[in-house]
Every structure is written in C-alpha cells, then in structure tokens.
C-alpha cells in the first residue's frame, strides 16, 4: 500500500493541493456571515433595480404597442381610407309635374330605339350601360342633357298657340316678353330634375330663380323661354344656346367649389392622420357641413324644396363647431386656442345682399357612430378594457381643454368649463404603476429588515445542506 502511494506522487500531490485550497478558501466562522450578508444585500439591490426597470419598460411597451393601434382602429372605423372615392348618397327622386302624354295616333317608341322619352330625365335615368347612339352622336347624360332633351319640352307649346313676340337682339333696352305662368310651371317641372354634380342639393331651377346672371349672362326664365320658342319654331336653327351657356357657367362654379373642397380634405388628412399630431376625431360630419357651407357661398340662392329652412349663414357656425382643432401636441401639454375654422361677416346686415335660406339638415353625430361601433365590437379582454379606459380618460381631458360650443338656438345642459391654456397629463394607468412599484419596494425592504433582525437568513442554508449530507 505504501509502495503504491509512492509510485504515484503526482496524484497524491494533486489531492493534497486541492485539500489545501479548500481549507484556505473556505470561509472562516468569523467572516462568513458578513460576506453572505453583503452578497445578499447586493443581490437584493440588483433585483430591485431590475424589477423597477422591467415594470417601466413593460408599461411603455404596453402603451405604445396597444394604445396606438387601438386609436388607429377607431380612427379607421370612423373615416374612410385616404384615396378612396367619396360615395355619394343617392338623391331621392323629386316630385315633378307630369308631362303631357303623346298623341293617341302616334305610337310610342319601343325600348332601345331613338324615339322620344317621357321620364324624369336625369333623376330617374337608368344606369350607364348600353344606350343607343342616335345619328352617330352619343346621347348626352347628366346635367348636359338639360338643354338637349327637347322632345318633351317641344310638346309644352302647341303650334296653334301664338307665341309672344321675341326680343330683338339689337334693342337691349326693351323689356323681354312675358310668358304665362302655366308654361313657366311646366318649365319648372323640367329643370327640377337636374342637379349639379358636386353641389347636388341645388337644382337648376333653384339657380335660375336666385342666380340668373352667372358670369354676366342673362339666364332669366323669360329669356330662356323666348330662346326655346325660337328653337321650336325653326328646328334647323340649332341648339338651345341660351340654356347651354347658363348651364356651363353653373358647372364652372361647381367645379371650382369641388377644388376648394379637395384642398380642405387634403389639409384634414395631412394634420389629423400624422403621428406627431394628437387629434383623433370623426371628420365625416365636419366634411359634410363644410361642403354644405361651401356650396352656399358659391351659389347664394334659396333652396326651394325643403321641409324647414334656416339662414345659410347657420352652416358657417356648424362648421366652426364641428370641425376639430388642428394643433400640435408633444404628449406632455394639450394646447388651447382658437378653432381651425372661424366665421367672418356674420354681422353684415347690408341691404345689398339678400339673406338666403337653406335646408335645415339633421347632421349625423359622431358620438352616435362611435356608440354603434362599440356595440358591434366583440367582448373585450381585460387588457383591451384597460386601453379603452385610458383613451376614454384622454378624450375627457381633451374636451375639458377644448369645450364644445353649441350653435345659437340650442340649449346645452352641460356645465360650463373654465378656459385653460394647458395642463399636465396623469392617467390612472401611471398612478397604478407607481403604487405597484412602491408595494414591491416595500416588500424588498421588509425582507431585508427581517434578515438583519436575526430571522432566517441566507447564511443558514449552507449549514442545513451540510447537516443533510452528514446524515446521509
């Protein structure tokens, strides 16, 4: 046995070295509690710091990843996507005066031919499709057909009825001929079927009554009637030139109004869809009111076919009330100020400009659409309910800094709020986060104090392990 031990000196030396190292580096009873206590204190501080930063990072990622997609979801549900064409609501057919039927001896033209048509012209016209081409020229449609579909108008004037003398072209001072009111009513039934392309709430009849001199043209009813009689009397004389010139002038103003509306729509999309701006609101009602106000400015006439009328200047107040504030936000302060649209000239009572009346329209409320959207949603999870409560608090805070002003004539039961230029945001989620962090820190401090007071510490764990090893 001794011989074997001396034959392997390297192995014994290694065992002796390991034993010495363990004895040298083993903690002494005097300094072991101090070292373990210092090491445990460092671990506790590291754990507390790691826990604190983890909670802050989780809260930030939670708000960034959950709240903003939620806002985009609400925004996309409230407004149509950019680039999509605006859907026009179908206008209900208007009640028109019946046109006289064709003579009994004349057969009615079969469908698909080029005979005279007795219908409501453009309002009840069939959809664009296969239409017969008469004489090699496509049949005009829309507003252009108001002065070309003369088959029905030619029957309004019987050949036996003597026509009133027309106004000579060289005598401008002579008054135009007066026509009976019955024929004007039949002419009214014809022009009430045609509306503008963009400002589709205005008929040609409304424009002829209230705006009879567009671009210095004479578009009075007597002038149009006299020109129509001349066309009917001599079929080869040409088209209804006076009517065509007036319709073209109205169409130019309508296109100009549509260009201004497109510019306004572009501004709303630029500032309300960008990430660096805070406002997320329903702009559908704002656009509808702005369109109505814009058309009332370009066509200062009274709309004839309305159930109730309001002054057209009321549209301007609706735009100022419904359109949002276009103001930046830095996520710390909500800025207050004037609205993005301000009405001017409402107090102008000069007799030069007659006050026109427009239809009293019940505008669609954005709150009703939001309520319908919420009712159609699937049941929310706890996390979605938290994000919803956060944005509900944000919208309440926004309405606090930007109070809603009702137009004149409406009584609001809401209490008035004091104007505030700005205020800090402190959402309930951040309050709950601070309480959670304080509770965790209190737990760590309590655990540390229990260890320092002689409770069960980390230094007793190695002793327990040694006792179990000896028993085995």
UniProtKB/Swiss-Prot annotation:
One of its GO terms (biological process) is calcium ion import across plasma membrane. Keywords: Glycoprotein, Membrane, Transmembrane, Transmembrane helix. InterPro entries: NALCN_aux_factor_1/2 (IPR055288). The chain crosses the membrane at residues 47-67, 433-453. Residues 77-114 are annotated as: Disordered. Glycans are attached at residues 120, 193. Residues 90-110 have a biased composition (Pro residues). It is a multi-pass membrane protein. Its main location: membrane. It is found in: Membrane. One of its GO terms (cellular component) is plasma membrane. Belongs to the NALF family. Probable component of the NALCN channel complex, a channel that regulates the resting membrane potential and controls neuronal excitability. This is NALCN channel auxiliary factor 2. It comes from Homo sapiens (Human).
């Amino acid at each position: 046995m001794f011989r074997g031990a001396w034959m392997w000196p390297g192995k014994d030396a290694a065992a002796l070295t390991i034993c010495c190292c363990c004895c040298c580096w083993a903690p002494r009873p005097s300094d072991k509690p101090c070292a373990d206590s210092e090491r445990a204190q460092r671990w506790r501080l590291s754990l507390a710091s790691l826990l604190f930063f983890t909670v802050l990072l989780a809260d930030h990622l939670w708000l960034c990843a959950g709240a903003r997609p939620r806002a985009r979801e609400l925004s996309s549900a409230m407004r149509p996507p950019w680039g999509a064409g605006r859907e026009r609501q179908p206008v209900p057919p208007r009640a028109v005066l019946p046109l006289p039927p064709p003579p009994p001896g004349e057969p009615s033209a079969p469908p698909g031919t080029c005979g005279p048509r007795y219908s409501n012209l453009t309002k009840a016209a069939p959809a664009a499709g296969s239409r017969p081409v008469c004489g090699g020229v496509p049949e005009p449609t829309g507003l252009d057909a108001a002065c070309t579909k003369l088959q029905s108008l030619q029957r309004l004037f019987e050949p036996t009825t003597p026509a009133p003398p027309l106004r000579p072209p060289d005598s401008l001072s002579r008054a135009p001929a007066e026509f009976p009111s019955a024929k004007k009513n039949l002419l009214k039934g014809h022009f009430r079927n045609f509306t503008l392309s963009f400002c589709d709430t205005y008929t040609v009849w409304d424009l002829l009554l209230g705006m009879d001199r567009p671009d210095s043209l004479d578009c009075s009813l007597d002038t149009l009637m006299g020109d129509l009689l001349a066309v009917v009397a001599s079929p080869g004389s040409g088209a209804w030139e006076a009517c065509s010139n007036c319709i073209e002038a109205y169409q130019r103003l309508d296109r100009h109004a549509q260009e201004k509306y497109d510019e306004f729509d572009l501004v709303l999309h630029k500032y309300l869809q960008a990430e660096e701006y805070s406002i997320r609101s329903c702009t559908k009602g704002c656009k509808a009111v702005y369109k109505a106000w814009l058309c009332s400015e370009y066509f200062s006439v009274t709309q004839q076919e309305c159930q109730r009328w309001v002054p057209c200047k009321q549209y301007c107040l609706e735009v100022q009330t419904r359109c949002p504030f276009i103001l930046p936000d830095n996520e710390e302060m909500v800025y207050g100020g004037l609205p993005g649209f301000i009405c001017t000239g409402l107090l102008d009572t000069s007799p030069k400009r007659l006050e026109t009346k427009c239809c009293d329209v019940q505008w669609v409320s954005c709150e009703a659409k939001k309520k319908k959207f919420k009712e159609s949603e699937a049941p929310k999870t706890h996390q979605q309910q938290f994000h919803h409560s956060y944005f509900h608090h944000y919208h309440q805070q926004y309405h606090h800094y930007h109070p809603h002003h009702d137009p004149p004539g409406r009584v609001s039961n809401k209490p008035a709020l004091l104007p505030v230029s700005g205020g800090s945001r402190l959402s309930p989620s951040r309050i709950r986060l601070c309480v959670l962090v304080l509770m965790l820190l209190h737990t760590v401090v309590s655990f540390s104090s229990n260890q320092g007071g002689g409770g069960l510490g980390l230094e007793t764990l190695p002793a327990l392990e040694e006792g179990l090893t000896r028993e085995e």
